[in-house]
């Protein structure tokens, strides 16, 4: 018989220890991975609810199982809040991840072998935008576009490629690009050749919801996102559109279920509903504005300390520190900062001579530190500590001293007070 007082700690101490250790790591380390964030206790409460027990194949009021009257309420709340948040007329909250949301778009709009124009992974794109190791690169004819010498997207080259290759779909969005994307220009190019415009806004969804980054929903035929990252919700995916095209909406729904998934994760959808409600609050706008302020402060400090930032700065939540020409790889920088309790990820940079497993750069983002309460002053201090470590990556004393500074600031700015 199941009892409410059953706990992991009493039943599985080995697993509980790993959970406890990870909780401590999150509190004692500064998180700068651009795709990570801290979700609210309310979201975690939803994810730990009895909604996890319910199968609900189909969509609200069109289920294949009985007993769905309450999960219909949950999913409808998530759908309506997502539409309100991004100005959409359609939302599908069932994708289990951003990648699965993206695969549903491919399935809905394309046939295998169709030509797709997507951002080069080496220039800041994403695996699902056409990488040869991903389903997108294996099933479709991918034409990559990239950035120019200034580190900005080259729209003239994008248009030239579009006219030459006439892709059936163009993809906007990125995983490591620090500029503002001109969604309207991309739609003009797509319309010129009669292509679908699909935008993956996963990295900047929170900024977009808060109005501090341009919204692609009015311009694209279809938009996808994750619900974590800057949006600070549970791990999951989302599909949106404002195309007022019921045929398109039906194709997208069918591509998610039954095309790519079975039963939705109702406990996660409840978490999404909570996160969307939180993102509609005024304080969320204040938070996202601070995310960008902190990123700009960090980028400026890196440059002052002699480090190169791809694109020369940032207009969003992330930046790429370019280590080409230095006697330090991205992998080594990642490891050295880890010893100082600062978590980043190694990342390839444009024209990187090193392999993706080594790289010549690190990607840094500010959503998580801003969630802790960091403002510009703390962000500048942190950047100087990072530069101290990078300048002295083989000096154990510098790493130890930096670690103590990190532990002190983490105590002053806890994740969960």
From Swiss-Prot:
Cofactors, names only: pyridoxal 5'-phosphate
Site (Plays an important role in substrate specificity): 228
UniProt-recorded Gene Ontology molecular function terms: glycine hydroxymethyltransferase activity; pyridoxal phosphate binding
Major subcellular site: cytoplasm
Residues annotated as binding (6S)-5,6,7,8-tetrahydrofolate: 121, 125-127, 355-357
Signal peptide span: none
Modified residues (N6-(pyridoxal phosphate)lysine): 229
Keyword Transmembrane helix set for record: no
Pfam families recorded: SHMT (PF00464)
Record's GO cellular component terms: cytosol
Matching InterPro entries: PyrdxlP-dep_Trfase, PyrdxlP-dep_Trfase_major, PyrdxlP-dep_Trfase_small, Ser_HO-MeTrfase, Ser_HO-MeTrfase-like, Ser_HO-MeTrfase_PLP_BS, SHMT-like_dom
Claim: Cytoplasm is one of the keywords in the record: yes
Keywords associated with the record: Amino-acid biosynthesis, Cytoplasm, One-carbon metabolism, Pyridoxal phosphate, Transferase
Pathway assignment: One-carbon metabolism; tetrahydrofolate interconversion; Amino-acid biosynthesis; glycine biosynthesis; glycine from L-serine: step 1/1
Annotated CDD domains: SHMT
Source organism superkingdom: Bacteria
Quaternary structure (record): Homodimer.
Role summary: Catalyzes the reversible interconversion of serine and glycine with tetrahydrofolate (THF) serving as the one-carbon carrier. This reaction serves as the major source of one-carbon groups required for the biosynthesis of purines, thymidylate, methionine, and other important biomolecules. Also exhibits THF-independent aldolase activity toward beta-hydroxyamino acids, producing glycine and aldehydes, via a retro-aldol mechanism.
Protein family membership: Belongs to the SHMT family.
Protein's recorded name: Serine hydroxymethyltransferase
Gene symbol of the encoding locus: glyA
């Amino acid at each position: 018989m199941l009892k409410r007082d059953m706990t992991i700690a009493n039943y599985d101490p080995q697993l509980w220890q790993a959970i406890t250790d990870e909780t401590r790591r999150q509190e004692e380390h500064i998180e700068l991975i651009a795709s990570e964030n801290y979700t609210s206790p309310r979201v975690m409460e939803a994810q730990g609810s009895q909604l996890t027990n319910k199968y609900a194949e189909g969509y609200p009021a069109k289920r294949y199982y009985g007993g769905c009257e309450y999960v219909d309420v949950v999913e409808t709340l998530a759908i309506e809040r997502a539409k309100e948040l991004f100005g959409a007329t359609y939302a599908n909250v069932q994708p289990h991840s951003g990648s699965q949301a993206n695969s549903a778009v491919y399935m809905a709009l394309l046939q295998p072998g169709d030509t797709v124009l997507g951002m080069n992974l080496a220039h800041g794109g994403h695996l699902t935008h056409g990488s040869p190791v991903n389903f997108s690169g294996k099933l479709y004819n991918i034409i990559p576009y990239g950035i120019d010498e200034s580190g900005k997207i080259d729209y003239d080259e994008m248009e030239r490629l579009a006219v030459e290759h006439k892709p059936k779909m163009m993809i906007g969005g990125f995983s490591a690009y620090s500029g503002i994307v001109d969604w309207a220009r991309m739609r003009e190019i797509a319309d010129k050749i009669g292509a679908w415009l699909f935008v993956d806004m996963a990295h900047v969804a929170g900024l977009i919801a808060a109005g501090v980054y341009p919204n692609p929903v009015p311009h694209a035929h279809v938009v996808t996102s994750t619900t974590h990252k800057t949006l600070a919700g549970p791990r999951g995916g989302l599909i949106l559109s404002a195309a007022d095209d019921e045929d398109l909406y039906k194709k997208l729904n069918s591509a998610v279920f039954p095309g790519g998934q079975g039963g939705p994760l109702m406990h996660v959808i409840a978490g999404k509903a909570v996160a969307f409600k939180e993102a509609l609050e005024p304080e969320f706008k204040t938070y996202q504005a601070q995310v960008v302020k902190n990123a700009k402060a960090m980028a400026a400090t890196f440059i002052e300390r002699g480090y190169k930032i791809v694109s020369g700065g940032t207009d969003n939540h992330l930046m790429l520190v370019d280590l080409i020409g230095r006697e330090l790889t991205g992998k080594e920088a990642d490891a050295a900062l880890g010893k100082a309790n600062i978590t980043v990820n190694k990342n390839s940079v444009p024209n990187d001579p090193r392999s993706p497993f080594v790289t010549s750069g690190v990607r840094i983002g500010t959503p998580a530190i801003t969630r802790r309460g960091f403002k510009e002053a703390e962000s500048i201090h942190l950047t100087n500590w990072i530069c101290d470590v990078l300048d002295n990556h083989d000096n154990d004393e510098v790493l130890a001293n930096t670690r103590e500074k990190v532990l002190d600031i983490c105590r002053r700015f806890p994740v969960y007070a």
